[in-house]
């Protein structure tokens, strides 16, 4: 556990203490669950403390997995977490439209739907 403030709805710890703890570790894989994803705005969230933790996890991870259901694509939220990056693995459900999937693929973003 990192310590910090507990965000019950997200079941996570956040805040300056949590961020400082994460400064001292490296992780193999991180799973990020954004509020929204769009080609124009990137990976986004709606709670600043939670977004800070997501940013830090991306920074300290060897592999980054972005998991979002299909309803979150081509939507925006309040705070940008990160740019879309072809090195990340994007996981969604099979409900994503063929058109949206093709647009992302043509921009170098591969979506795993299985």
Which residues are covered by each model-predicted region?
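Conserved phosphate- and dinucleotide-binding cores of soluble alpha/beta proteins
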Residues: 1-114
């Amino acid at each position: 556990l990192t310590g910090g403030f507990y965000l019950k709805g997200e079941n996570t710890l956040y805040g300056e203490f949590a961020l400082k703890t994460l400064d001292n570790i490296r992780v193999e894989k991180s799973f990020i669950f954004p509020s929204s994803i769009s080609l124009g705005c990137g990976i986004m969230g709606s709670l600043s403390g939670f977004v800070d933790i997501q940013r830090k996890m991306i920074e300290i991870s060897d592999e980054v997995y972005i998991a979002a259901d299909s309803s979150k694509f081509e939507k925006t939220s309040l705070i940008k977490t990160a740019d879309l990056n072809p090195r990340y693995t994007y996981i969604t459900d099979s409900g994503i439209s063929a058109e949206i999937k093709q647009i992302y693929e043509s921009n170098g973003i591969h979506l795993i739907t299985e």
